[in-house]
Amino acid sequence: MSVVRIGPYTLPNRLILAPMAGVTDRPFRQLCRRLGAGMVVSEMVTSDVRLWNSRKSRLRLIHDGEDEPRSVQIAGGDPAMLAEAAQRNVELGAQIIDINMGCPAKKVCNKAAGSALLRDEALVAEILDAVVRAVDVPVTLKIRTGWDRDNRNGVTVAKLAEQAGIQALAVHGRTRADLYTGEAEYETIAAIKQAVSIPVFANGDIDSPEKARKVIEQTGVDALLIGRAAQGRPWIFREIDHYLRTGEHLPAAPLPEVQSILLEHLAELHLFYGEEMGVRIARKHVGWYLATLPGAREFRAQFNRLQDTDAQCASVRQFFAERQNNGTGVAA
C-alpha cells in the first residue's frame, strides 16, 4: 500500500477526515483520529481575521494537544486576506494550511469563496501563489470537479495548483452546481490524478469499505477524504483501513462500544463548548449515531428537549440499556 506524504509529514494510512463546517470541531477530530483516521482537517475558518473574535471562531482556532499533522482549512476570496489568515493559523499551531475551493454553500459562494472561485482561474492562481508564499508549512487545496457539468475545469485548476507549489489536492466528485445531489463521479478525479504529480485525494460518497477500494482502483488516488459517512459513525475509518489492508471486514461495532463512543463524544462536546452550547451541538451528533437503530426518531424528539448535560448522558444510557436488553444487536 502506497505511503501518503504531505510535505514532511507521512500519514499512517490513506484515510482523511474531510473538513465539514459545524462538524469537524476539535472533539470530533480527536475521536476520528483515535478510531483510525490518518489525518483530520479542521472546520473552515474565515480568512477575515476581523471576524475571529466571535466565540465560534475562537473555538475553531484551538489545536492544543492534537496529533500531528494539524491541518486547518481557510476560506475566502482575497489573496492578501487568505495569506494573512494562513500566517495567523500557523502561529496558532497549524502545520498544514488547506484552502477551501470546494464548499458549494450559497453563503460561501455568494462571497466569492469556496467553489465559486473555480469560475475565475486567474484569481485561483493568485490566491494559491499568495498563500504558498506566505507560510513555510505545506499548503493543500480542496476543490470540486468544476462550476457545473458544462464547466468541469478541475484538471486546469489542478495544474495551476501544482505550478503554485500546492503539496496535495483533494477533489470532491461533484460540481458546485450539483451541491450534494446525485452521485459523485470519479472520472474527472482520475483525469486529475493523471495530469499532475502531486498527491491527489478523492472525496464524495465514500461510505463503505468496498466503495473506498473501488474509488482507489478507479482513480488511482493517493488517499481518500471521508466526510458525511463519518457522521455518527467515526469508526468507519478503522473499518475501511482494515479492509484496504486485509481484504476482510471487521465485525460491526457492537452496541456497548457504540454507547461508549457516543458518551465519550458527548462528554468532550460538553467540556469543549460548555453546557449550554455543548448540549445544543450534541443533539445533531446523537441523531447521526442513532439513525439506524430502532426507536431513534421517538428518542430524538425527547432528547432534543433536554437542557443539561447530565440529562443527555442519562438518556443515552437508558436508550442503549433498553436495546441491549431487547437483544437489538449491533450498529450499522
Swiss-Prot record:
Instruction: Spell out the Pfam families in the cross-references.
Output: Dus (PF01207)
In terms of domain of life, where is this protein from?
Bacteria
- Binding sites annotated in the UniProt record for FMN: 19-21, 73, 142, 203-205, 227-228
Asked if the Swiss-Prot or TrEMBL record annotates the protein with the keyword RNA-binding, the reply is yes
Which CDD domains does this chain map to? DUS_like_FMN
**Cofactor(s) the record lists:** FMN
- Per the Swiss-Prot or TrEMBL record, the active site comprises 103 (proton donor)
The record's catalysed reaction(s) read:
a 5,6-dihydrouridine in tRNA + NAD(+) = a uridine in tRNA + NADH + H(+); a 5,6-dihydrouridine in tRNA + NADP(+) = a uridine in tRNA + NADPH + H(+)
Any one GO MF annotation of this record = tRNA dihydrouridine synthase activity
User: What's in the keyword line of the UniProt record?
Assistant: Flavoprotein, FMN, NADP, Oxidoreductase, RNA-binding, tRNA processing, tRNA-binding
List the EC numbers from the record: 1.3.1.-
User: In which family does this protein belong, per the annotation?
Assistant: Belongs to the Dus family. DusB subfamily.
Q: What does this protein do?
A: Catalyzes the synthesis of 5,6-dihydrouridine (D), a modified base found in the D-loop of most tRNAs, via the reduction of the C5-C6 double bond in target uridines.
Indicate what this protein is called per its UniProt record. Answer: tRNA-dihydrouridine synthase B
The coding gene here is dusB
